Regions:
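C-terminal motif of bacterial Sec signal peptides marking the signal peptidase cleavage site
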Residues: 15-18
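Short glycine/acidic-enriched loop and turn motifs that connect beta-strands
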Residues: 42-45, 90-94, 142-145, 192-196, ...
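Post-signal peptide N-terminal segment of secreted/secretory-pathway proteins
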Residues: 51-148
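Beta-propeller blade signature
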Residues: 53-55, 148-150, 154, 199-210, ...
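Beta-propeller fold detector
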Residues: 59-71, 106-118, 156-169, 215-221, ...
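Repeated scaffold domains used in trafficking and secretory/extracellular systems
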Residues: 70-82, 118-129, 167-178, 221-232, ...
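Short, conserved, GDST-rich strand-edge loop motifs in beta-rich repeat architectures
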Residues: 187-201, 239-256, 303-323
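Intrinsically disordered, low-complexity segments enriched in Gly and acidic/Ser/Thr residues
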Residues: 275-368
Length: 399
């Protein structure tokens, strides 16, 4: 494999450095145009080696780990375009460090805050919403709380306690995606079995006024297992995740339900009581669907599984469900119509996506996780993009 030498060199360098590099972010990094941070990883005999790498494009090229920020363990990337900085979380030590990239392309570490004293036991992916350069919210489903912190001064300002009833015995409490409008941010709360094969009925909607930090919680019994959320022209859409149709396919109503969509229209702060949407009506019969993301053109990108080949026996695991024949489709919001199958072969379920103004990428990873290529599915044919050693965990545009 063409990256074999690069992989060995990258692992050797990472283990020798132990933590991070002082090398520039890259000789070809431009101070103009888009800038992305790619979080990827390689498995080594000493554990997972993580790389945070700056790049100006996702459309082509090979990622060079010789200039990456390198960390062991299970770190997280927290970032948002336009802030001028990003944060890397140490999941084991529950610490968050602020980083910038200087004019010469160096990663510059700033201050660090610890969430350990606030009861946080581990740091989740995509758990932070940046309301402004000086105000961020970390959602913690393990302790039913939201931690408010200042990313510029790197201090915790307060902890917002959510009702203890959101944590259910013998269930995994899950917080869905952040989605926001001016002055307010939302996420949903759902509950799955500890084996991730059933989803409890109903959900809770958490709304935070980002000016006053006032919290409002409402319940809804029409959908369950909401994960993906998006703001499309001021209307907030909430889509059920992959476990709910899995549970329904195996256990019926006791395990889940077909895909389900709720919305909050402009000017309102709770779900529209007169509207429930679905992806299924526009997709082929005999399939189940789950939304992955909504792109900048108002298309919801969906993974669709062929139920004739998906396992349905009692005791089927989510891993077996993920390994079924999944294809990529996109539908147009707000009608959830104009269904188009993307130019890709059927394969295993993958939740990774990243969009730009003119492309939509999924990841194609080797069976041994040694190499990954981003694949643009936005056109009539699949187009290979950025190639990298190992597997990709997250990509965020910071400029």
């Amino acid at each position: 494999m063409r990256f074999r030498t690069a992989i060995l060199l990258a692992l050797t360098a990472a283990l020798a450095v132990g933590c991070e590099t002082d090398d520039p972010a890259g000789p070809d990094i431009s101070n103009e145009g888009p800038l992305y941070i790619v979080h990827s990883a390689l498995e080594s005999p000493d554990g997972r080696v993580n790389y945070f790498t700056a790049t100006n494009t996702l459309a082509s090229g090979e990622l060079d780990y010789g200039h990456s920020l390198t960390l062991m363990g299970r770190p997280r990337l927290y970032a948002q375009e336009g802030l001028g900085y990003f944060a890397v979380a140490n999941a084991e030590d529950v610490e968050i460090t602020r980083y910038t990239i200087d004019d010469e392309g160096h990663f510059v570490a700033g201050d660090t805050i610890s969430l350990h004293h606030h009861g946080v036991r581990s740091l989740g992916a995509q758990a932070v919403y940046f309301a402004s350069p000086t105000r961020a919210y970390y959602k913690d489903p393990n302790e039913a709380q939201v931690i408010v912190w200042n990313p510029e001064e790197m201090v915790v300002e307060k902890t917002i306690d959510l009702p203890a009833s959101l944590i259910r015995e013998n269930r995994v409490t899950s917080f869905g995606d952040w989605v926001a409008r001016e002055g307010e941010a939302y996420f949903t709360v759902g509950w799955t079995s500890q084996t991730y094969d059933r989803v409890d009925p109903g959900l809770a909607l958490v709304r935070i006024d980002t000016t006053t930090d006032e919290v409002t919680i409402t319940e809804d019994d029409r959908c369950r297992g909401i994960e993906t959320a998006a703001n499309v022209d001021g209307t907030l859409y909430f889509f059920s995740g992959v476990i709910s149709p899995f549970g329904y396919h195996v256990y019926g109503n006791d395990g889940g339900q077909p895909d389900c969509i709720l919305r909050i229209v402009p000017g309102e702060t709770t779900f529209d009581a007169d509207w429930v949407g679905s992806l299924a009506a526009s997709l082929p019969d005999g399939t189940a669907a789950t939304a992955a993301t909504v792109d900048e053109n108002g298309r919801v990108w969906v993974q669709v599984v062929d139920l004739s080949t998906a396992p349905s026996a009692e005791g089927t695991t989510y891993g077996e469900w993920y390994a079924a024949d999944w294809t990529w489709w996109h539908l147009q919001v707000p009608g959830f119509d104009e269904a188009v199958r993307a130019p890709s072969a059927a394969g295993a379920y993958s939740s990774f996506t990243v969009g730009t103004e003119d492309a939509f990428y999924i990841s194609q990873t080797a069976s041994d996780y040694s190499e990954t290529t981003l694949i643009d599915l936005s056109g009539e044919s699949a187009v290979p993009g950025l190639n990298l050693p190992g597997f990709v965990l997250d990509i965020v545009r910071i400029r």
